[in-house]
């Protein structure tokens, strides 16, 4: 009866997240202090006080979400919980993979925060504002969504990029690329029978080929930090397999910038490898909700508040 810990991605941020963890657990507060020191600014003040529009900027949201996830984990550990002894696998959605890797000892908390700040800035700068877009497609088979993307790319100027960026499961796919191509693909998906095709309010076309400049920046950034083999298997977004090779993990993180987040397959992999319980560690309950739709046999829980820390400790022993 294995347990998996998962770490949320962008979109789960909210002003005030993690504050009660920091108030209840000195070890959790220390995580926020470590990240403030690493970034040379009071990110914790922004997390707890806002404004929301500044917190939502990708260069802030990415390290902020990791801070809350690692604070929740440190709170568990402060009460005697052992990640290595109690958890079989970890994974994270997009930026959450960095949280999972920091939790597993692949990189230090400080380096992970700096990597995510670099990643957020690089992804934001890769495409001029207004030229990229993303859309959520609900209730359409993946093959039909991919066909719509291919048709839209061919029908747009200069063979514009359009691709599936996130396979979230539960009938939800996210497409990403050039604005004109994504808008056309969303229209085509509706014509093919999608229940909804919703343009997303995002600042850049994440997880698309247009992020190639950001991928190169991350290749250099990852080469410049100390890396260790994780103490617990981390299931990769890009390959849906764990590896203990630090260089291979770094390669997969570079590929992740332009590649698909294969979250549905990740949850399916958990089920196939004996996971009976999945916890979402950090802000929100997006991943636990997705997991319930993907595999109803996996029980879910969340660890993002002081009360949830206590509940998880009682359940996990």
Predicted regions and their residues:
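NAD(P)-dependent dehydrogenase/reductase Rossmann-like domain
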Residues: 181-183, 221, 274, 306-307, ...
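Alpha/beta catalytic cores of group-transfer enzymes, especially the acyltransferase/condensing modules
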Residues: 10-13, 39, 84, 104-259
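Conserved functional loop/turn residues at catalytic and ligand-binding sites
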Residues: 94, 226, 274
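Short, solvent-exposed amphipathic alpha-helical segments in soluble enzyme
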Residues: 23, 151-153, 190-192, 288, ...
């Amino acid at each position: 009866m294995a347990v998996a810990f998962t770490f949320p991605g962008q979109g789960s941020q909210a002003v005030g997240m993690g504050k009660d963890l920091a108030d209840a657990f000195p070890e959790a507060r220390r995580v926020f202090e470590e990240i403030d020191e690493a970034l040379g600014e009071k990110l914790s003040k922004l997390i707890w006080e806002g404004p929301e529009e500044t917190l939502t900027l990708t260069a802030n949201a990415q390290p902020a979400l990791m801070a809350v996830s690692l604070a929740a984990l440190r709170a568990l550990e402060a009460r005697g919980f052992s990640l290595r002894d109690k958890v079989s696998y970890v994974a994270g959605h997009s930026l959450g993979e960095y949280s999972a890797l920091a939790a597993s000892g692949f990189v230090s908390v400080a380096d992970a925060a700096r990597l995510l700040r670099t990643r957020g800035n690089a992804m934001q700068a890769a495409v001029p504002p207004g030229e990229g877009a993303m859309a959520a497609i609900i209730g359409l088979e993946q093959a039909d969504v991919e066909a719509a993307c291919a048709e839209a790319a061919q029908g747009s100027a200069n063979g514009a990029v359009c691709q599936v960026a996130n396979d979230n499961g539960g009938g939800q796919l996210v497409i990403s690329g050039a604005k004109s191509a994504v808008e056309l693909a969303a229209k085509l998906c509706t014509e093919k029978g999608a229940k909804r095709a919703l343009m997303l309010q995002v600042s850049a076309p994440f997880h698309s080929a247009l992020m190639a400049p950001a991928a190169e920046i991350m290749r250099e950034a990852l080469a410049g930090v100390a890396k260790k083999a994780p103490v617990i298997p981390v299931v990769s977004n890009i390959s849906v397999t764990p590896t203990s090779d630090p260089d291979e993990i770094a390669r997969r993180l570079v590929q992740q910038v332009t590649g698909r987040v294969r979250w549905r397959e990740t949850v399916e992999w958990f089920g196939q490898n004996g996971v009976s319980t999945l916890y979402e560690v950090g802000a929100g309950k997006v991943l636990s909700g997705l997991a319930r739709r993907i595999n109803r046999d996996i029980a879910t829980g969340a660890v993002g508040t002081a009360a949830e820390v206590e509940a998880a400790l009682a359940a996990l022993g």
